[in-house]
Design a protein with these regions (language model features):
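Non-catalytic, solvent-exposed segments at the cell envelope interface
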Residues: 1-191
Length: 191
């Protein structure tokens, strides 16, 4: 994601995990993007930085449990689905869906229900991130962000300094206008 606090814009990009890209440690040899994770967060950041020719200053990493915890701590999120589909015991409609953490995780993980598989899953993950951003920027959440973050301790890892989080929260409370969130999904075929 690229976040511009001055223009209140967020750019989200989904890159399929099975894309073959040069890893930052591979001397130009291509491997699946997902394999960058084997070498740690710095290799992931450097590989994405090389791929898109952008500087990546911070990371935010969580696992499935952390994702569920965050969505539940927010009181659920609203996601907009491109399709009506089912995933396990959950059904989703085309359009707006109100989801708790477990349902949001099912929404984000499903790929077999779609002709485009992992590509649609990536789009659904972007929709969930939008839902989280929209919810976390609500004044009711921001007024208690410190206790919110404390309650979620251990649910995620980030290199974003607490001071920067505080600045962003104060700016959002001062100017409660919505953020412009744009998302793109990379597409393509192999050589």
């Amino acid at each position: 994601a690229v976040v511009n606090a001055e223009t209140r814009q967020i750019l989200l990009v989904s890159t399929p995990r099975d894309y073959y890209v040069p890893l930052s440690i591979s001397n130009g040899k291509k491997d699946k993007l997902t394999h960058a994770g084997i070498y740690g967060i710095n290799v992931c950041m450097d590989t994405i930085s090389m791929l898109y020719d952008v500087d990546i200053d911070y990371f935010f990493r969580l696992n499935f449990t952390g994702f569920v915890d965050i969505v539940d701590a927010l009181g659920g999120i609203t996601v907009v689905s491109d399709y009506t589909f089912t995933a396990g015991n959950y059904s989703f409609v085309k359009g707006e869906n109100q989801l708790d953490g477990t349902a949001a995780l099912a929404f984000c993980r499903e790929r077999h229900a779609f002709a485009t598989g992992d590509r649609q899953r990536g789009k659904n993950q972007l929709a969930a991130i939008k839902g989280i951003v929209n919810k976390v920027t609500e004044p009711s959440i921001l007024m208690n962000y410190s206790s919110f973050l404390s309650a979620l301790e251990g649910s995620f890892e980030t290199s974003i300094p607490y001071s920067l989080i505080s600045e962003l929260v104060k700016a959002q409370l001062t100017d409660n206008s919505a953020w412009d969130i744009v998302s793109y999904s990379v597409d393509g075929t192999g050589d």
